[in-house]
C-alpha cells in the first residue's frame, strides 16, 4: 500500500484518536497502536482502549492498494510531531507490515502489526437515538464534566447522566458535594430514555467536538452508545446502574436570594480564600441588607481576612459556609455577568443560577454547605 498525505493534517487526526489509548495496556498490545485502514483514496484511523473506540477518516492522494495495518501510536506521533507542513509518502509492506515514511529530507522506518487483529467497533443493540448540535453538546459537557465524581464505591456518579424526554435534553453531573444540571430544549427523544456516559469518553468528546451547528447523531442501548459527527465516530461502553434522583436533592422555595456580579464575587473569594484553614477551605458568607460579607480565618496561624461586597439581597440576615475551591469552580463555569444565589438556611444546599441563559438553555448549580462553628 502507498499514499501521500499532509504531515500536519495527519498529525492532527492522529492526535485526536490517540487520546483514547490507555497509558498502560497489558491485555492487548495492539491497543497501543493506531489502525490504518486504506480503502480507495480514504484513510480511516482507529484507536481503542477496549471500552471506548474512536474512528475518523480523511482523504489522501495517489493511493495504491488497500488493507489494514496497525502502527505504534508513540512512534507515529513522535515522528510526525516534529515535521513542518509538507507532503509525506507512506509505503506499507502488506507482508511484514513494515512502514516507510518518506519526507523531503529523510526516510523513517518501523514495523507494525496485522490490522485484522485490531478489535472491531462494537455494534449498538438498541434503537434509542437523538440529534444534537456539536456546539450544544460541547457546551453541555464543558458545563458539567468537572463536577463528575471519582468514587470507586459509587460508579454511577463517575459519569455524566444523559436524561432525555420528548421535550428536552438534560445533562447532570454530581460528586455528592456539588451538582450541575444543564437543560436544552433543542434535543430530545421520542420517549423518555437515559444513560450514564463515563468520564473518559466524555473528555474525548470535549476534545474533538467543534463549536459549530453540525449535528451529532447519538444512538444508545443498554451497554453502549455511539456518537457520530462529521467523519468521526466514537463508540463507548456505558456505566451500568441507576443514577440518583437529582431533582429530589434540589431545594425548592428558597426565601433568601442574592444577585451579584459574578467576576467580582470570584475575585473576592480568591483573595479571602488564601486565609482560610487549609484543611477545610471554609469561606463564611454573611448576608444582610444589600451586602455580602466574605470572611475566612485560620486560628492555627492567626490569619484572617474579610471583604464586603455590594449586592441585591432579598431575605433575612443569615450566614452560610462553603468550601472555597468548589464555590470558585462553579462560578468559573458560568458565562453570565451576574449570578443569583438562592439560599434557604445554613444547613441546606445553596443554588447558583446565571441571571442570563442562552436561548433554549437552562443551567443550575448546587453546592452543599460546610458547618459553621460560631
Regions found by a protein language model. Name each.
Residues 1-374:
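Structural preference for solvent-exposed beta-strand-turn elements
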Amino acid at each position: 500500500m502507498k499514499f501521500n498525505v499532509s504531515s500536519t493534517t495527519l498529525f492532527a487526526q492522529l492526535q485526536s484518536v490517540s487520546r483514547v489509548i490507555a497509558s498502560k495496556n497489558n491485555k492487548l498490545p495492539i491497543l497501543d497502536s493506531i489502525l490504518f485502514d486504506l480503502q480507495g483514496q480514504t484513510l480511516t484511523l482507529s484507536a481503542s482502549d477496549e471500552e471506548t473506540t474512536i474512528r475518523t477518516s480523511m482523504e489522501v492522494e495517489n493511493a495504491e492498494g488497500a488493507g489494514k495495518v496497525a502502527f505504534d501510536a508513540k512512534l507515529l506521533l513522535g515522528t510526525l510531531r516534529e515535521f513542518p507542513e509538507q507532503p509525506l509518502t507512506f509505503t506499507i509492506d502488506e507482508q511484514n507490515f513494515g512502514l516507510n515514511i518518506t519526507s523531503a529530507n529523510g526516510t523513517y522506518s518501523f514495523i507494525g502489526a496485522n490490522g485484522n487483529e485490531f478489535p472491531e467497533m462494537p455494534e449498538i443493540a438498541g434503537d434509542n437515538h437523538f440529534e444534537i448540535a456539536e456546539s450544544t453538546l460541547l457546551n453541555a459537557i464543558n458545563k458539567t464534566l468537572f463536577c463528575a465524581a471519582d468514587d470507586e464505591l459509587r460508579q454511577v456518579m463517575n459519569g455524566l447522566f444523559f436524561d432525555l424526554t420528548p421535550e428536552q435534553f438534560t445533562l447532570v453531573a454530581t460528586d455528592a458535594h456539588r451538582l450541575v444540571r444543564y437543560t436544552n430544549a433543542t434535543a430530545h427523544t421520542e420517549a423518555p430514555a437515559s444513560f450514564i456516559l463515563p468520564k473518559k469518553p466524555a473528555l474525548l468528546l470535549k476534545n474533538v467536538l467543534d463549536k459549530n451547528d453540525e449535528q451529532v447523531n447519538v444512538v444508545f442501548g443498554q451497554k453502549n452508545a455511539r456518537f457520530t459527527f462529521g467523519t468521526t465516530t466514537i463508540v463507548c461502553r456505558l456505566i451500568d446502574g441507576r443514577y440518583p434522583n437529582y431533582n429530589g436533592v434540589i431545594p425548592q422555595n428558597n426565601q433568601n436570594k442574592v444577585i451579584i456580579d459574578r467576576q467580582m464575587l470570584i475575585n473576592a473569594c480568591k483573595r479571602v480564600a488564601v486565609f482560610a484553614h487549609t484543611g477545610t477551605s471554609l469561606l463564611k458568607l454573611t448576608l444582610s441588607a444589600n451586602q455580602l460579607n466574605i470572611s475566612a480565618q485560620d486560628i492555627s496561624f492567626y490569619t484572617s481576612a474579610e471583604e464586603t461586597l455590594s449586592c441585591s439581597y432579598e431575605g433575612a440576615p443569615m450566614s452560610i459556609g462553603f468550601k472555597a475551591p468548589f464555590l470558585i469552580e462553579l462560578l468559573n463555569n458560568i458565562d453570565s455577568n451576574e449570578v443569583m444565589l438562592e439560599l434557604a438556611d445554613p444547613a441546606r444546599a445553596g443554588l447558583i443560577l446565571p441571571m442570563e441563559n442562552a436561548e433554549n438553555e437552562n443551567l443550575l448549580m448546587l453546592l452543599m454547605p460546610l458547618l459553621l462553628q460560631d
